[in-house]
Every structure is written in C-alpha cells, then in structure tokens.
Amino acid sequence: MDFQRKISGLVIILLLSVLASPAQRFVAVPAGHYIIGKKGHLNNPRRKVWVDSFYIARFETTNREFAAFVAATSYVTDAERKHDALVFQPGLREFEWIEDSTAYWRYPNGISRGGIENKMDHPVTTISYHDVEEYCRWAGVRLPTLEEWEIACRAGSTTDYFFGKRDDSISRYANVWLGWDHTVADSSDGYMYTSPVGHFAPNPWGLYDMYGNVFEFCSGAVVQGEKETLVHARGGSWWCSARSCHFFNSFDIGRVHKRASFSNQGFRVAASSLPNRK
C-alpha cells in the first residue's frame, strides 16, 4: 500500500511538472525604471535603466527540457561535434580546466564521471551560446538581456546581493563552492557539481538559483563594438568560491567565447510575452 502511494505521488509530481502552465513557470516583471550596477564598477557602473515588461523563467533550463528539444529536432551540440568541452576536477589549480573529448550535455563532466540519467531536474550544462540560441528558437523563447537578468536577480534590491550587503547567507540561496580553494573537493552542501533546480531558497520574486549552480547566458554587449564571438553570462556557478570566481552577486558580468562549452555553464529563458507551452 505504501508503495502504491509513493508511485501515485510520483505520477502526480511528474504530471504537474509537465503540465505546468507558462504562468506558473515564468515570473512577470513590469516595465519601469530600475537601478542596476555597482558604483565604480568598470563594466557595470551604477545607473538607472528603463526596460519594457518581460517574463523570466523561475528555474534554469533543465536536462529534461533540453532532452525534449534534442528528441524533437535531432540537434547536435557544439561539444558533440568539436569534442572540445572544458570540464573541472577537484585538485586542479585555480582557473585551470581540462579539455575532455567525451564531455557534452549528456555527460557534462565527461563519460568517466557519469551521465545525467538521475539528474534530469539539474540544469543542462556543457552547451554553448550557439546551442542555446537554437534551443530558444525551437522553444519560442529568448535569453534575458544583461539588464533584464540583473533586474530579475535584484528583485527590487540595490545591494550587492538580493539578501543584503554581504555574502554571509549565500549557502542558503546558492549552490557554490564552499571550500577556500579548489585543491580540495567540497560537497558539504550535498553537491559536488550541479544541484536540482529550485533546491535552494528563491529570491524575493520567486526566482531560484540566480546565484550559483550554473552561469547563465545573457544577450547583449557590455561595450559597443564588442566582438561578436564573445558573449556574457551571470550569477556564478557551483565552481565559484569566495576566493576565486566570486561572480555569485547581482553586478558582475562574465565573458566567454560563443562556441565554448563548459560544465558550469547553462541558461535561463525569458520572453517578451507569455510563451506557449512547448
């Protein structure tokens, strides 16, 4: 009897996940003026910006969602074609990644470290910006702009973090590297790499994993005339620690090659109007 209850509960959860309406999966952000940036920041100075209303996903795009895209289109990612994905393993020096020809979204850290079979609710990684563009085209959505992402992340705050001025509470809201550096493996929060989306507490607007878990691609340029091969990502990832890659905040902006695939890189979608369910 207990087993039957568990199975019934699982079916209900799966149905709710699949049938969730766009209104449940997205947060509406009203048009208006917003304060973004940080005083003295070279690439993102404090300023007031206007944005039109938009919608942004509550969660980062998952392996399950990306798998549906691949199943429908037979799409082959950059990492699968080029065999040049970059993955991380504990014990390497700071900012040192290794190329793994076996790594792609189904095996985000390489075949030797296992696949995503039991991680369908984790964010998809080891994909390029180009791959994400193709997904968005299929799904009828888009990436948030740099400004939209920050407005959604801040959730009305003007401090460095949506929960205050200091990062003391980061472990409540984000899957980040809690060790002092990367020479020692750290999974004290239960996750060495990615965690299920929505596992940590949301920001005040109900958006999950705005900090940590995976870097999130954004559209737009930091400066005029920027090379088209360079794109941007925000929010930090599971790899970011207090000592290095301290990007789990509301103001920093990362930069990466458009065709590069990293095991800590993912995305969250947005839309100008409420999208149809795919």
Predicted regions, residues:
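Bacterial Sec-dependent N-terminal signal peptides
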Residues: M1-Q24
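Functional-site microenvironments in short loops/helix caps that host divalent-cation chemistry
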Residues: V27-V29, H33-I35, V76, K82-G254, ...
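Acidic/histidine-rich helix-loop elements
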Residues: I35-N44
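Short Gly/aromatic-enriched secondary-structure transition segments
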Residues: N44-R46, A68-A72, K82-H83
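A short N-terminal beta-strand-loop micro-motif at the entrance of redox/enzyme domains
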Residues: K48-S53
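Short capping motifs at secondary-structure boundaries
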Residues: F54, T61, A67-D78, A139-G140
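Terminal peptide-recognition signature
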Residues: I56, T62, F66, V132, ...
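Short beta-strand-to-coil "C-cap" segments at the C-terminal boundary of structured domains/repeats
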Residues: V269-N276
